[in-house]
Amino acid sequence: MKIIIATHNPHKTEEIKNFFKGYPVEIYSMADLGIKEDIEETGNTIEENALIKARFLKEKVDGIVIADDTGLFVEHLNGQPGVYSARFAGENATYEDNNKKLLKLLEGVPYEKRKAYFKTVIAVVEREKETLLEGKLEGHILDHPRGKNGFGYDPVFYVDNLEKSLAELTMEEKNKISHRADALMKLKNYILKRLEEK
């Protein structure tokens, strides 16, 4: 089975390939197929963005297309950065820029009011069918970055029951508990079901 991921992000591609190791599934990114176009994420929600990306790519390729979008939702900030998580500090913001802006906005806010959750939505687009799968991880925002692993908001997102930030976890540890892992687990079950149907 051929799955194409609507992303230019090598981290995401690697993560998804790891998840499907040992399964009869071939996974390609847009880069693998030489598709260089940027897909404009014009949706008002992460669900809309995931579907926009998957539908765009499905018009160009055969196979099952998946696209995801992730947002960090901070309670104290009324759900910000949300759909703007990747460009929270501006259009060409780095991970570090986004983290700095978030920490600045939460300066002086006590720990119990720094509740946040990550949500990943995966859109699966096939010939006649569109499916949305969702994963979630709850935690708190730290007052300074911790850890060297991962990417994005991982250094400032604290997983309470592990007493570590996401950036302090190994890829294996993160893959067991993250919002992406939760959504990818649902994707894996979905794909395995599709393999059984063949």
UniProtKB/Swiss-Prot annotation:
Record keywords: Hydrolase, Magnesium, Metal-binding, Nucleotide metabolism, Nucleotide-binding
Quaternary data: Homodimer.
Keyword Aminoacyl-tRNA synthetase: no
Catalytic center residues: D69 (proton acceptor)
InterPro entries per record: dITP/XTP_pyrophosphatase, ITPase-like_fam, RdgB/HAM1
Gene Ontology biological process terms in this record: nucleotide metabolic process; purine nucleoside triphosphate catabolic process
Pfam families with a match to the protein in the record: Ham1p_like (PF01725)
Cofactor: how and how many bound: Binds 1 Mg(2+) ion per subunit.
Cofactors required: Mg(2+)
Protein's recorded name: dITP/XTP pyrophosphatase
SUPFAM superfamilies: ITPase-like
Its EC number(s): 3.6.1.66
Binding site for Mg(2+): E40, D69
Chain residues that bind substrate: T7, H8, N9, P10, H11, K12, T70, F151, G152, Y153, D154, K174, H179, R180
One GO cellular component term noted in the UniProt record for this chain: cytosol
